[in-house]
């Protein structure tokens, strides 16, 4: 553990989604994880017990709403309610991965905006602040009427590539779609590299998608960047398209390794040399295939918690360590 934190009113609790990350965060802050238990009744109902006094405390609850999404979300809501009823002074939700973020707008008639519904539930339960990481849609910050601190994984991912000598003019940072251009540009700034964009088009119905590459990638080391990888279909096809276009090597990176369904097999079979991910979502050892390298956001989030508690800006955390 780092130096013991000076203020005993700061308390950190972990629920079940990602306890290893919570332990790293608590270690970075300099506190022990708070004592609580989460159990289920035989019918599946969730019960939370806080096993120490938190009256007047500034509480931070660590919980990603990754799979099982609904169980993890319900755990969080029940915990917030318990903290409120136990007279916590502030209830700060630390959600490294915000589930339901892809449902941020009405893409078709009569669709819900579930990302907003989740925000409403968290606020109504009693949260006073949200701390999260690389939201799928940044406008989700505006779904809350409480303060939202939005951290970026790009500096940590950039540090990984810089430490492995992957930077400069021989590198091209690639966005797998139009929506990720801003994210790719940020990583490119850190790596002092140009960017390219993959433009997916379906020429006509029942014809396979064509991947047009906007930018020069021949003979270059390409670094794909996305906020999350779910089934890995897009990222694998993008990597193969870059290789076919003459790329020397292809690396991929994301903040949130959802990696559901056929994702691991697709990554294994693809042209990707290495996939760099963070530990915002817990990956069991059997899912950490050889191609996956993991960097931790524990210190980043721990530093953010200390800055928030001490009323300091979090903007210095948006830079790489290797300047």
From Swiss-Prot:
Q: Which residues bind ATP?
A: 43-45, 102-103
List where in the cell it is found: Cytoplasm
User: One Gene Ontology cellular component annotation?
Assistant: ribose phosphate diphosphokinase complex
Query: Which reaction is catalysed here?
Result: D-ribose 5-phosphate + ATP = 5-phospho-alpha-D-ribose 1-diphosphate + AMP + H(+)
The active site consists of 200
| Required co-factors | Mg(2+)
Per UniProt, what is one Pfam family of this protein? Answer: Pribosyltran_N
What keywords would UniProt list here? ATP-binding, Cytoplasm, Kinase, Magnesium, Metal-binding, Nucleotide biosynthesis, Nucleotide-binding, Transferase
Give the residues the record marks as binding Mg(2+) 2: 177
Main localization category: cytoplasm
The UniProt annotation places Mg(2+) 1 binding at: 136
Entry-linked InterPro entries: PRib_PP_synth_CS, Pribosyltran_N, PRibTrfase_dom, PRTase-like, Rib-P_diPkinase, Rib-P_diPkinase_bac
Q: Where does D-ribose 5-phosphate bind?
A: 202, 226, 230-234
A GO molecular-function descriptor: ATP binding
Q: Which GO terms describe its biological process?
A: 5-phosphoribose 1-diphosphate biosynthetic process; purine nucleotide biosynthetic process; ribonucleoside monophosphate biosynthetic process
Q: How is the cofactor bound?
A: Binds 2 Mg(2+) ions per subunit.
The source's superkingdom equals Bacteria
Give the EC number(s) under which this enzyme is classified.
2.7.6.1
Q: Does the record carry Cell wall biogenesis/degradation as a key word?
A: no
Q: How does it assemble?
A: Homohexamer.
General function of this protein: Involved in the biosynthesis of the central metabolite phospho-alpha-D-ribosyl-1-pyrophosphate (PRPP) via the transfer of pyrophosphoryl group from ATP to 1-hydroxyl of ribose-5-phosphate (Rib-5-P).
NCBIfam families tied to this protein: PRK01259.1, PRK02269.1, ribP_PPkin
Q: So what family is this one in?
A: Belongs to the ribose-phosphate pyrophosphokinase family. Class I subfamily.
Protein name listed in UniProt: Ribose-phosphate pyrophosphokinase 2
Ranked from the top, the taxonomy reads: Bacteria, Bacillati, Bacillota, Bacilli, Lactobacillales
- Gene encoding it? prs2
């Amino acid at each position: 553990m780092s130096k013991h934190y000076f203020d005993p009113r700061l308390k950190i609790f972990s629920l079940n989604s990602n306890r290893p990350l919570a332990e790293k965060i608590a270690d970075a802050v300099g506190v022990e994880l708070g004592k609580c238990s989460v159990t289920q009744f035989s019918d599946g109902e969730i019960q939370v017990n806080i096993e120490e006094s938190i009256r007047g405390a500034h509480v931070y609850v660590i919980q990603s709403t990754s799979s099982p999404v609904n169980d993890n979300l319900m755990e969080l809501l029940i915990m917030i309610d318990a903290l409120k009823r136990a007279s916590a002074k502030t209830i700060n939700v630390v959600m490294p991965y915000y589930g339901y973020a892809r449902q941020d707008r009405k893409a078709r008639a009569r669709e819900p905006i579930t990302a907003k519904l989740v925000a409403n539930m968290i606020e109504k339960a009693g949260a006073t602040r949200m701390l999260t990481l690389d939201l799928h849609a940044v406008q989700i910050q505006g779904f809350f009427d409480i303060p939202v601190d939005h951290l970026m994984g790009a500096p940590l991912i950039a540090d990984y590539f810089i430490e492995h000598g992957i930077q400069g003019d021989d590198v091209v940072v690639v966005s797998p779609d139009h929506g990720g251009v801003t994210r790719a540009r940020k990583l490119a700034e850190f790596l002092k590299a140009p960017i390219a964009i993959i433009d997916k088009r379906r020429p006509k119905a029942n014809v396979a998608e064509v991947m047009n590459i906007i930018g020069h990638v021949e003979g270059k080391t390409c670094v794909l960047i996305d906020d999350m990888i779910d089934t890995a279909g897009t990222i694998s096809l993008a990597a193969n398209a870059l290789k076919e276009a003459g790329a020397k090597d292809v690396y991929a990176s994301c903040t949130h390794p959802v990696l559901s369904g056929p994702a691991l097999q697709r990554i294994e079979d693809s042209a990707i040399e290495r996939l760099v991910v963070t530990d915002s979502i817990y990956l069991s050892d059997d899912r950490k295939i050889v191609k996956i390298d993991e960097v931790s956001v524990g210190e980043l989030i721990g530093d953010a918690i200390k800055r928030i508690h001490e009323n300091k800006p979090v903007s210095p955390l948006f830079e790489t360590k290797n300047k």
